[in-house]
């Protein structure tokens, strides 16, 4: 990262499932705490896989978080003493999240967001592409393809061990029981006609 002389910027951490996005967000938040900065972490209410009130990485690291159901609810929890605002699973927030993040950065906060940049079909997911476009720093992480061992940039959704169809619902909260990291070549998304 470069030294930034002005306060207020946006950092995006993105990638496939199991690429370490939440782990990296937690690492950055912990570093701010060592620096005696005040950080607050948010997560969408829909993300209750491991905990209702913590951001938890797949390897078990965790940090306290405020669950919110709407992007603009974040403003209710911000105080002037805050230095850093972190938001996990940003792809699950409503369309207002881009404006919320912009406003916070413009007010002088360091805003760190983490989320999937692609849905299970391999298409841009939610507001993450817009956040990547307005961010000062973008970190794109990769996992390891569970099929061949290559770098994985995609998320394979599985239903009873088989790839989910293209027109299945986009949002399905889950972990290793429903998803695997895959490379471009091992990622499969059949249409319902193919099944």
From Swiss-Prot:
Entry-linked InterPro entries = P-loop_NTPase, Thymidine_kinase, Thymidine_kinase_CS
Q: What is its main location?
A: cytoplasm
Residues annotated for Zn(2+) binding in this entry: 145, 148, 183, 186
Residues that, per the record, bind ATP: 15-22, 88-91
Annotated coiled-coil positions are: none
For this protein, the record's Pfam families field holds: TK
What GO molecular function terms would the record report? ATP binding; thymidine kinase activity; zinc ion binding
Keyword vocabulary terms for this entry: ATP-binding, Cytoplasm, DNA synthesis, Kinase, Metal-binding, Nucleotide-binding, Transferase, Zinc
Give me the reactions it catalyses: thymidine + ATP = dTMP + ADP + H(+)
Q: Which residues form the active site?
A: 89
Instruction: Name the GO terms of the biological process aspect.
Output: DNA biosynthetic process; thymidine metabolic process
EC assignment: 2.7.1.21
Compartment annotation = Cytoplasm
Q: Which PROSITE patterns match?
A: TK_CELLULAR_TYPE
Subunit structure, interactors included: Homotetramer.
Q: Which family does it belong to?
A: Belongs to the thymidine kinase family.
* Protein's name according to its UniProt entry: Thymidine kinase
Instruction: Please spell out the taxonomic lineage of the organism that makes this protein.
Output: Bacteria, Bacillati, Bacillota, Bacilli, Bacillales
